[in-house]
Amino acid sequence: TEFFRELPGIALIFILAAFYMLSAETMFKIGAVIMLCGMGMHALLPPTKVLAILAICVYSIGEHIQLAMKSTLSLQYAREGRGGAAQGFQSSTNQIGTLIGYLIIIAAFTLLDNQPYTMFFGLAAVLAAVSMFCSFKLVGKSETDSTKRRFYFHKKYTKYYMLEMFYGARKQVFLTFGPY
């Protein structure tokens, strides 16, 4: 299933190209709606292999759209000269939230006799809905500034780069070996 989870990341190039005229805020909102659909599919559909893979793909498309927009929005809404700090804060709070979520899942599945997958997917869908409605509060209309560089590689952002590498490596290890 790792292939099907990562396939939307590759498709993201084409998705973003097709919707290049939309603002980062609008794309982030679209990603939230797609993520909610995918998580809702996990919660409501029977757990057959094909439907589970379809739900993973739908959720992952939304997640990849949001991943692409998080940095853009963090930089856009940051105070002047504080873009790196904003990205670092956003990334670290994301990491902490993910870690807390993993610990809750581990504790629940250790303490409970039956494995309440449907309940957790339902709860995740509710949280995705809350997140989606929060994202609808974004009102800005970002536009690409053609006078600025597209990629930033600066020494002062080293911590941010390391956090992103840690996030990707941790996620790959967990998704590869977590089911076993």
State where each predicted segment sits.
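C-terminal ends and interior cores of transmembrane alpha-helices
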Residues: 13, 33-47, 110
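Glycine-rich segments within core transmembrane alpha-helices of 12-TM secondary carriers
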Residues: 87-105
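C-terminal membrane-cytosol helix-exit motif in multi-pass small-molecule transporters
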Residues: 105, 109, 125-144
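Hydrophobic core of transmembrane alpha-helices in multi-pass small-molecule transporters
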Residues: 38-39, 49-66
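Helix-loop boundary and gating motifs at the non-cytosolic
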Residues: 1-10, 156-180
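Transmembrane alpha-helix termini and helix-breaking/packing motifs in multi-pass membrane transporters
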Residues: 1, 13-21, 100-121, 180
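Intracellular juxtamembrane helix-capping segments at the cytosolic ends
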Residues: 65-78
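Juxtamembrane intracellular "pre-TM" segments in multi-pass secondary transporters
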Residues: 137-169
